[in-house]
């Protein structure tokens, strides 16, 4: 019996760049909740950037790709970047002449801009805020660093760090988080918090940063619009986000009744 459902946001619940759920996706979430299934939003977005959908209350917010997780008002998991690693990454990116974004539960700011980073923010309907005091803010706890880059640059960005990893849902920008985080580890923390087994959980996702989440639950469902690498690691594949894949899967697998 499914007791909790984890959902990626962009490319899973929402079309990339969209702000509103489709009617069927909204219905599916409400029906799952009515059927006593807990809802967890599992996103690479920062805590301040999570979308809010009318009439839908998520029981858990898994943000920063799993670096900061809240169940209601209770923080059940948090793990900022280690100071030395954070400083080294920022130094590496400055040497590469990259604009850098940093974020925690209180702010999300940048030290500059470039087209790919702007598009990254635009996908989440966010505006980049360039902070004059960026270097001072870097001394705060930081859960995620974001920058534009390509896969062949990953090693250069992480050079000299010990406990960091790159996770990506787009091929032109990345999220840099602690090695001990990621959506999979955060899912495990959520399941432990509620006393649920892996088999009592289902997850939906489309990005490479969703793979470990899909593998951490009993049923990992990849969207049809996901990359092949994600589909190969999933237990099932549903229709695309444009075709209301979450709704269709939940109806076909008797998690909810169909809309009238």
Predicted regions span which residues?
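Non-catalytic pre-domain segments flanking phosphatase-related domains
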Residues: 1-7, 30, 34
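Asp-based phosphoryl-transfer active-site loop
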Residues: 3-18
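Active-site phosphate-binding/coordination module
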Residues: 16, 20-116
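Residue-level signal for inorganic ion chemistry
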Residues: 32, 65, 145, 187, ...
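Short, structured coil segments at secondary-structure junctions
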Residues: 56-57, 65, 160-163, 216-217, ...
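Short hydrophobic/aromatic-enriched beta-strand-loop microsegments
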Residues: 58-66, 122, 166-169, 221-224, ...
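Conserved acidic, metal-coordinating active-site core of Asp-based
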Residues: 92, 96-216, 225
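Asp-based, Mg2+/Mn2+-dependent phosphohydrolase catalytic module
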Residues: 216, 221-260
């Amino acid at each position: 019996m499914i007791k909790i459902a984890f959902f990626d946001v962009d490319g899973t619940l929402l079309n990339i760049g969209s702000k509103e759920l489709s009617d069927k996706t909204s219905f599916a979430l409400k029906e799952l909740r009515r059927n006593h299934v807990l809802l967890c939003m599992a996103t690479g977005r920062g805590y301040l950037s999570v979308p809010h959908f009318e009439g839908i209350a998520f029981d858990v917010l898994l943000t920063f790709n799993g670096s900061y997780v809240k169940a209601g008002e209770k923080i059940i998991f948090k793990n900022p970047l280690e100071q030395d690693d954070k400083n080294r990454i920022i130094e590496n990116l400055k040497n590469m002449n990259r604009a850098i974004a940093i974020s925690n539960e209180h702010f999300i700011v940048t030290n500059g801009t470039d087209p790919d980073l702007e598009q990254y923010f635009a996908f989440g309907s966010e505006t980049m805020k360039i902070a004059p005091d960026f270097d001072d803010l870097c001394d705060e706890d930081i859960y995620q660093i974001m920058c534009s880059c390509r896969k062949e640059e990953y090693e250069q960005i992480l050079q000299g760090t010990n406990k960091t990893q790159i996770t990506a849902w787009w091929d032109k920008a990345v999220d840099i988080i602690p090695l001990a985080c990621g959506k999979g580890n955060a899912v495990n923390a959520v399941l432990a918090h509620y006393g649920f087994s892996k088999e009592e959980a289902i997850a939906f996702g489309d990005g490479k940063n969703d793979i470990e989440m899909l593998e951490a639950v009993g049923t990992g469902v990849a969207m049809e619009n996901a990359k092949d690498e994600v589909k190969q690691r999933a237990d099932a594949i549903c229709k695309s986000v444009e075709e209301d894949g979450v709704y269709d899967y939940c109806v076909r697998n008797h998690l909810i009744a169909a809309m009238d």
